[in-house]
Amino acid sequence: KDAKDPLNFSQTITSSSEMMRVIIVHFASLMYYTAIILDLAELKIPKKITFTGMGSKYIKLITDDEATLSLIVSRIFAYYGKLVDNNDLRAANIQIQFSEEPKLVTAQGGLIMESKPLKDHLIPDNCLCHGYTNEEYGTTVTYGQMSSMKKGILDSFNKFCGLFVEDSMVQALSKLGLDIPTNFVNTMKEYAESSFDIVLNDNSDEQKAQFAIGDPMFFWPLKETLYQMTKECNQEALNNKEKEHQ
């Protein structure tokens, strides 16, 4: 057993193509949202990306091969670039670099971000991109506006789901022996609205109506969806194992 993973949790996930689909969708959503920010804020497309914090270690469950992960991220950026007609994103050629000490990179990044002149070129802390259709950079959305934003957010989520049936993405994932089948994508879409509604209902407080929403609405259709997909994928994996032993 791995001393850092005594319950073999990582091995359980990586040995299941069904469970790996959830990991891929989660990672892809983060990279897709990064592309949204780069587009709306009109930022220069980075040449290199490294992941910080201990939480980022889960990314290596997908692959520890930097070249393959670089290809996947570049395809995600290119897909979104095509949707919004951003030629810089379309031509993205991202190089992923893993750090042996992600916590150290986090600390160093914090110091760099506070330095001049870089600080002047960063997105302000109080400016949040939500990813809804036809969003204008810098627009504040309040909790009282949640319901009116629902259609735009779900439209955006459906476009995100289209990533996984895009030929270029299918080819990139195939290098890892993985895929996101059509029925998986369709099930995600089915859960999306109820997932959004759960977050909406949790925040439907008149006292909060005038306050700005503090987290990206882009992820609202995904929160409950990933939980439900994890349960379904786990059950599918168990069923497949039973069939193998029959």
Spell out what each predicted region is.
Residues K1-Q246:
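Helical "lid/coupling" subdomains associated with nucleotide-phosphate turnover
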